[in-house]
A protein has these predicted regions:
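Short periplasmic/luminal acceptor-recognition loop of GT-C membrane glycosyltransferases, typified by
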Residues: 39-82, 108-116, 141
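Membrane-embedded, lumen/periplasm-facing catalytic core of multi-pass transferases
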Residues: 18-54
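Periplasmic/luminal catalytic loop of GT-C fold multi-pass membrane glycosyltransferases
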Residues: 81-140
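Transmembrane alpha-helical segments
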Residues: 1-26
């Protein structure tokens, strides 16, 4: 009957909608956790430089942090920004693992690293960086207070 079809359709809609909302909340819970940690330790986010990857910068920028990279390609190419080819630099860093050059060049305050990339394993054991906060997806590092 029409009522049975309508009821079944509503059940499917509510189930799918609930799954979408749950997935969306889970997707942002890890980056939000890191952001809240940083907000709890920084009084002026606009003065804080954060190394971020392609997919994470926009979230932190929303809260006022200065981020290395986000998904806006128009500002990542030297032909447009007239300063650095950030997107190419990022690609080389991810492929070759030369994170130290990029990290030193920009003098970041924080390094937001996804735990599923190879750079995480390098940085985790690099004595020049100290882990400050982590969750399932991200690790947040700062420069360690070590003499060279």
């Amino acid at each position: 009957t029409v009522i049975s079809i309508y009821s079944a359709a509503m059940l499917v809609y509510c189930t799918v909608n609930n799954l979408f909302i749950t997935e969306t909340n889970n997707r942002y819970s890890d980056i939000n956790d890191i952001t809240q940690y940083m907000l709890g330790h920084e009084t002026n986010p606009s003065q804080v430089k954060v190394y971020t990857s392609f997919n994470d910068g926009a979230y932190l920028e929303f809260y006022g942090f200065k981020c290395y990279l986000d998904a806006r390609m128009e500002i990542m190419l030297k032909s447009i920004n007239q300063q650095n080819d950030i997107f190419n630099e990022y690609g080389k860093m991810r492929y070759y693992g030369n994170y130290k050059d990029v990290f030193d060049k920009y003098d970041f305050n924080y390094f937001l690293i996804e735990k599923n990339i190879k750079d995480y394993e390098y940085i985790k054991y690099d004595s020049k960086y100290e882990l400050k906060h982590e969750n399932n997806k991200y690790a947040l590092f700062v420069k360690a207070n070590v003499s060279e």
